[in-house]
Amino acid sequence: MFMFLSHPLDPEGYAWPGEPVVKTTQCTDVSDDCPFCSFVSELPNHCGTHMDAPRHFVKDGLSINDLSIDYFCNTEVALLEIPKGPAEGIYKEDLEPFADILSKVSFALIRTGMEKYRETDQNTYQNEGSYIAPSAGDYLTENFPNLKGVGMDFLAIGSASSKCPEGELPPDCHRHMLGYYTGKFVTGVEDMHLADVPKGAKIKRFFNAPLLIKGLDSSQVVCIAEIE
């Protein structure tokens, strides 16, 4: 069974607070005067389900177009159940029980349960999201050289919440995961649709195909999983 694990891009959808979302403008429609339908899409690259490459927070880091195909096609994938609530971080201690799994996979998907707020409570999902704390970013980048990326069912690697303590602000979280300090990085796929993946399911293959637009730091990705 194949499943989409990315959300549709929606002009009424989500981005980081204050950042723009996708806009669509219809140019033509099928009529007596025109044989075809067409649209123009204006697409900020950090709205909807998208992949943060190092260049997002590292001046000389790799961009989405610099990453090898291995970052987008995965046959060793795990779904990690790590329940978290609004403005709660994922720490090294949360990941340590999964060390054996993380050592064997190229991509890990973290399901916290925060996705439940996406359709019911925009303020909570957008402004009080969970986050990947610096200790977790360091743990991932320092210990699992085969790990290419981590996907998450919350808005972003960092949280916009004012409850985040000093040292766990959004730039801190991104920098520790994307290689700002050491050059070692794990990419992040933010704002994923993981709610419908059956608990305990084996993910045989996972694809996160990017829009290869020249010059971008990061990109939307269409995420598709084959579930056994």
PLM region spans:
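Active-/binding-site microenvironments in catalytic and ligand-binding cores
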Residues: 1-228
